Amino acid sequence: MPAPIRLRELIRTIRTARTQAEEREMIQKECAAIRSSFREEDNTYRCRNVAKLLYMHMLGYPAHFGQLECLKLIASQKFTDKRIGYLGAMLLLDERQDVHLLMTNCIKNDLNHSTQFVQGLALCTLGCMGSSEMCRDLAGEVEKLLKTSNSYLRKKAALCAVHVIRKVPELMEMFLPATKNLLNEKNHGVLHTSVVLLTEMCERSPDMPAHFRKLVPQLVRILKNLIMSGYSPEHDVSGISDPFLQVRILRLLRILGRNDDDSSEAMNDILAQVATNTETSKNVGNAILYETVLTIMDIKSESGLRVLAINILGRFLLNNDKNIRYVALTSLLKTVRTDHNTVQRHRSTIVDCLKDLDVSIKRRAMELSFALVNGNNIRGMMKELLYFLDSCEPEFKADCASGIFLAAEKYAPSKRWHIDTIMRVLTTAGSYVRDDAVPNLIQLITNSVEMHAYTVQRLYKAILGDYSQQPLVQVAAWCIGEYGDLLVSGQCEEEGPIQVTEDEVLDILESVLISNMSTSVTRGYALTAIMKLSTRFTCTVNRIKKVVSIYGSSIDVELQQRAVEYNALFKKYDHMRSALLERMPVMEKVTTNGPTEIVQTNGETEPAPLETKPPPSGPQPTSQANDLLDLLGGNDITPVIPTAPTSKPSSAGGELLDLLGDINLTGAPAAAPAPASVPQISQPPFLLDGLSSQPLFNDIAAGIPSITAYSKNGLKIEFTFERSNTNPSVTVITIQASNSTELDMTDFVFQAAVPKTFQLQLLSPSSSIVPAFNTGTITQVIKVLNPQKQQLRMRIKLTYNHKGSAMQDLAEVNNFPPQSWQ
């Protein structure tokens, strides 16, 4: 049989192929020749054939039929054969294939070989693709080589030990004695791999940092020698001595100094030297400075050192390299919580980054700008952010608008400024704002009694001839309906009043109704506004009746229903119309979970103002309750009665009260309800309907201890209890769900079931997102009727999304305190 072509000739031949089909034909032809050679057990050219096969594998062609030939080369006594055999094993084999176990004995023999290069090949292969079984069998040999005096073998053995620890963490203690002398080595390769091994051990075991903290002075000494040493051609990179080793040492110091005062004190001086002596003109120096900054911010460093670190990040923002600017912004986001005033010094540079062409830098700069907003700089920062909102790409507008809303709500210097700012956002990016922006602005306007005339005049001007920004039109329609009389009377004192007639106001609202840009929701706002004006205007009531009657036959079901109900008010209930359509009272602002929450971005955390989310408006789906009952099993479970989202009449009078309004958890008298502008809708009877709207709960709740009903995977559910004054059989349980992990839990749903002798109602939760780092809680109220005073038992089901996975769990709660049910 003729000798096969050499690898170099094969490469040259393949490169001459003009088409992919021609290349594929050459590969198939050569693979056929290699297979024939393998079948004939040709030992002479096996090494050459496997080398060609590896090249084909690199091109993406199948080469699995050469796996056993690699094992034969490994068993050969020739170094050239072993080299190709081990390379093939690393490329063609992995721990998912049982074939790799066949070479365990060969690797063991080669680890004890007399030639260091053969030992090095075996260490490289084991460190690259060794399975947990192989690591357990060969860990002893690796540990012996870790103690050898040969620096070539020690560095390879250290890296192999890293792989062994990753695969079999319980073998970590085997390598502890060998790590004692590793840092005494002069060879930089051994030092580098030793630091990698120590870092891996500290990250894998929480006990290791305390064991290795005694090495901090030695690490500091090595790092100082690297900084102070002169030019060394062997280790010099762009004028810096071995930057790779410096970075690794800084990372290890960061782990060892975390939460330890003594270690942090020992490394303060060297970190200051690195930060001041490192050259920043080259990217190598910037990499070392970045690691230094991370170490300073992570350990218990001095305040002056932290200021130095943040100033380094500030210099990074001026760098021409986009990657360095992005890294600086990300790092400042992490530090702004602890060093807010220091980061403020770089505010102008951060704001300039909003004008960067790179979208990633823009987003980081926007997030950091919102984190820097406070009561002192709110006007200037909002001016910059509104300019950014006006010119940024569409994908930024929603987040930017939400951030402006939240910052304005928290730090607004005056109500007029607050209203002007939100109206500017709605005018600029109204189509991108969140759904809760409209009700939040309406609530703000309602509560700013002295600004009603000014606001309705501004909104009237804003929508003249432009209905493209639907949220703005909705707010304007609501305000015109509420305060149309102030608009017509021209009572605005803040700016020059405008002369508007009743017909002109109705013309605007009718234009909104017939505009092609108006959504169904916007038309509903406009029709309701026109109806409200029937009690505020005097000369146009007949026109309003005509408009309302026209939409009684609208093809939009929602609009038709509104029009029919309003027509009934004009005809059958005209004596109630003025009372039902009177002006809305001041609304109470409900906030949850504190002023701030943690926003998660790319695995890092930064503070952002809390986004107050309204509770879900609809009832809990019946199918979810039924699914819960199916999973819980048994026939002694009573179903969950869902909460009705609409209001129901109170037994005390004709007011409309929400279900949640029936129960005042603070024990204070219930607030007077708002007059309704729609007819009352009857509700099915509920077990607690007979309770009056008087204060229901007494101070006995203070004596009922709370319990932890569930605690697993970072999610904690706590129950607190209250008892009714008017009906002792009613227990109200308030659940609080908190999340101690680093990522938010989304789409959170809590369900519960009780035995048939009880009745249970779940009210709507405060949110569907459980914030990370215990920065907020979800609250939900459960009402339980226990007429027979039996011991309370409950089964719960939890569903949520976390780290991209859907989670679900069931639990049983039997440890209710006796005071909650006796």
From Swiss-Prot:
Topology term for the membrane: Peripheral membrane protein
A biological process term (GO) from this entry: vesicle-mediated transport
Span of domain GAE: 702-817
Pfam family, any one: Adaptin_N
Keywords from the UniProt entry: Coated pit, Cytoplasm, Cytoplasmic vesicle, Golgi apparatus, Membrane, Protein transport, Transport
Assigned GO CC terms: AP-1 adaptor complex; clathrin-coated pit; perinuclear region of cytoplasm
Keyword flag Protein transport: yes
Entry keyword annotation includes Transport: yes
Start and end residues of each stretch annotated as Disordered: 597-628
Subcellular location: Golgi apparatus; Cytoplasmic vesicle, Clathrin-coated vesicle membrane; Cytoplasm; Cytoplasm, Perinuclear region
The family this protein is said to belong to: Belongs to the adaptor complexes large subunit family.
Subunit structure: Adaptor protein complex 1 (AP-1) is a heterotetramer composed of two large adaptins (gamma-type subunit AP1G1 and beta-type subunit AP1B1), a medium adaptin (mu-type subunit AP1M1 or AP1M2) and a small adaptin (sigma-type subunit AP1S1 or AP1S2 or AP1S3). Interacts (via GAE domain) with RABEP1. Interacts with EPS15. Interacts with SYNRG/gamma-synergin. Interacts (via GAE domain) with AP1AR (via coiled-coil domain). Interacts with CLN3 (via dileucine motif); this interaction facilitates lysosomal targeting.
Functional note: Subunit of clathrin-associated adaptor protein complex 1 that plays a role in protein sorting in the late-Golgi/trans-Golgi network (TGN) and/or endosomes. The AP complexes mediate both the recruitment of clathrin to membranes and the recognition of sorting signals within the cytosolic tails of transmembrane cargo molecules.
Annotated protein name in UniProt: AP-1 complex subunit gamma-1
Organism: Pongo abelii
This protein's encoding gene: AP1G1
